[in-house]
Amino acid sequence: MIQKNWQELIKPSKIEFTSKGRTQTNLVAEPLERGFGLTLGNALRRVLLSSLRGAAVTAVQIDGVLHEFSSIAGVREDVTDIVLNIKEIAIRMEGDGPKRMVLRKQGPGAVTAGDIQTVGDVEILNPEHVICTLDQGAEIRMEFTVNTGKGYVPADRNRAEDAPIGLIPVDSLYSPVKKVSYKVENTREGQVLDYDKLTMTIETDGSVTGEDAVAFAARILQDQLGLFVNFEEPQKEVPAEQVTELAFNPALLKKVDELELSVRSANCLKNDNIVYIGDLIQKTEAEMLRTPNFGRKSLNEIKEVLASMGLHLGMEVPDWPPDNIEELAKRYEDQY
């Protein structure tokens, strides 16, 4: 009965996310076994701060500037200060880099991140952020290199051996999560008073929501810890008299949250009340694209996953949904 080691541990009946603006999210999870609040809180915090991928400027080239210790006529800040300001530009980028962005501005006035001319899959999240200030008649042109990565990469590691003269490497702050704190309190479940309640506050740069960041971090931990599981769980035997002949493929009883979709795709399906694969395959492509926040990228991802199972969108499923769908899903879970 090795399953009792994990099956009989209490799991949170409440996992609640509350957003406070665009960049801050609170998470409450309770009840947890005593000690698990600290275990999970510390593990999630470390992964959130160190292991999530993001985008950042890795280098900048400024017309007329050969190195970071220069000054520019008509610009109040020196190049060192400008580079420090460039480090704070918050960026969301789809796909991999490197990508190029250009900024051209004439004075007088402040030069902000919103003045940068971005390419289609790059978005500036803090357009009001000031990069430098121009005097009357001054002009500046910059070209930025943007890439994806994780954690913090110092400027000297962003310096390519064949870099042209005037290309200034920048410290890259890739992590989309800027700050994480947590606390553990006592909570009760029935008559038991010594369970844990975990409360976390996650602050991001806006390129990812706090809820998605926690989901990514949990998936990383799941992937790493799974390597230590050195056994197969015993299969449940279904009595012959309980086996019912279905009019459809039992795989349709599998829940869509088991498909390992991206967080965006999974959330779109959840918001559209699509629970089982049988619900999903009856949707047409046009119906899916009308789902809020569901785009062509998510559609292609779902089509690819379904194709690997021999399924596709727009299928007709007889006798769907069955009245006892939850019971059937549990009965057939070992068959798919």
From Swiss-Prot:
SUPFAM superfamilies: C-terminal domain of RNA polymerase alpha subunit, Insert subdomain of RNA polymerase alpha subunit, RBP11-like subunits of RNA polymerase. Residues 1-232 are annotated as: Alpha N-terminal domain (alpha-NTD). CDD domains: RNAP_alpha_NTD. The keyword Magnesium does not apply. Homodimer. The RNAP catalytic core consists of 2 alpha, 1 beta, 1 beta' and 1 omega subunit. When a sigma factor is associated with the core the holoenzyme is formed, which can initiate transcription. DNA-dependent RNA polymerase catalyzes the transcription of DNA into RNA using the four ribonucleoside triphosphates as substrates. This is DNA-directed RNA polymerase subunit alpha. The lineage of its organism: Bacteria, Pseudomonadati, Pseudomonadota, Alphaproteobacteria, Hyphomicrobiales.
